[in-house]
């Protein structure tokens, strides 16, 4: 069964395979109220509720060399902090995971820019934090929830006699840059500086006014240089995070600052994991070793790449950035695994176009409990784009939305916004 074969209901009849053009999206509107429990998708309840959970974490020293086993069937560019659900059937993989559970529970996920690529240069360590074994018709199945930990550079790949790949990797460090004003400020006064936390809301007028004054004073030392204040703000982590948060609030109006990481490194990875970009751009983000540089690149992508097209057709627009909304605590996009073991990073949008629906709605193995899914294909090339989700109860909101798989989407710059062609996207690196 191919990796891109969509999940279909178990009882498929000939009449269920009918292909119809979707008409609902033409009248679709952004839901004003969402009463869906956004914690359900992140818990991956479709894997089962009785998974054995592990605590603690395994972190390797920066620049250290490690030998880590590789899960070969995971064709995904994992971002640190991103959750990776897995269903493993092959005896080799089942045996490998069992051994990992007895050790440090860490395996390597290699970052391939495409399926044809034979050797990966970068990747991410993944640590198992939930585990379950079961049997289905005599076949042993392992269900796993893992989380990305650290970036690495691949030094060597070798295959053992049992067929398991071992990767010798170098753990990549995170470069923490000093404040943009550090070069012109007196070091003796650094300990006297006050960095107030940003107020959660504007209701606390006193704190908010103090915050505004702090923001104005933040770059006052720029007057001592030949460069303007705004130039320094372009490389200030706090300023970059605020600009990205404004973009994220367009996807989730109820987004709260305390639900996002306050650390620039963790925040940059959180944003990278929910950006609907192709593998080429994602590997570029994974290679970057500085949170500030990563944030600048992410903000550039969010501002420029406002259209999402079919990756196969390249010119057939499926949706736009304005249609994205969040239905999960992780944000508008997260990774889910289907019963065949294939992982789909799925983006939620409330409107999509140029799609045909295949078959009838099914609630089997639904990633969003309470919603039935229908396979969606590109109207032009018939490639699998994702699913249409429809509510099974009338009191649920939203009543319908789309889940688009990231691997089928190509981020592009609309011609009206930029003269560059999609294959000449210049990112702020």
UniProtKB/Swiss-Prot annotation:
Any idea where the Lon N-terminal domain is?
68-306
Family membership, please give it.
Belongs to the CRBN family.
Q: What's the stated role of this polypeptide?
A: Substrate recognition component of a DCX (DDB1-CUL4-X-box) E3 protein ligase complex that mediates the ubiquitination and subsequent proteasomal degradation of target proteins, such as MEIS2, ILF2 or GLUL. Normal degradation of key regulatory proteins is required for normal limb outgrowth and expression of the fibroblast growth factor FGF8. Maintains presynaptic glutamate release and consequently cognitive functions, such as memory and learning, by negatively regulating large-conductance calcium-activated potassium (BK) channels in excitatory neurons.
> What is the top-level taxon of the source organism?
Eukaryota
Chief location:
cytoplasm
Q: How does it assemble?
A: Component of a DCX (DDB1-CUL4-X-box) protein ligase complex, at least composed of CRBN, CUL4A, DDB1 and RBX1. Interacts directly with DDB1. Interacts with KCNT1. Interacts with ILF2. Interacts with TRAF6 and ECSIT.
Q: Where is this region: Disordered?
A: 1-30
**SUPFAM superfamilies reported for this sequence:** PUA domain-like
Which gene is this protein's source? Answer: CRBN
Residue ranges occupied by any CULT domain in the UniProt entry? 305-413
| Cellular compartments per GO CC | Cul4A-RING E3 ubiquitin ligase complex; cytoplasm; membrane; nucleus
Q: Which pathway is this protein assigned to? A: Protein modification; protein ubiquitination
Keyword annotations for this protein, in alphabetical order, are: Cytoplasm, Membrane, Metal-binding, Nucleus, Phosphoprotein, Ubl conjugation, Ubl conjugation pathway, Zinc
Q: What protein name does the entry list? A: Protein cereblon
Please list the residues that bind (S)-thalidomide. 365, 367, 373
Report what the Swiss-Prot or TrEMBL entry states about this protein's PTMs. Answer: Ubiquitinated, ubiquitination is mediated by its own DCX protein ligase complex.
Q: Which organism is it from?
A: Pongo abelii
Q: Where in the cell is it found?
A: Cytoplasm; Nucleus; Membrane
Which BP terms in the Gene Ontology apply to this protein?
A: proteasome-mediated ubiquitin-dependent protein catabolic process; protein ubiquitination
Q: Where is the composition biased (Acidic residues)?
A: 11-22
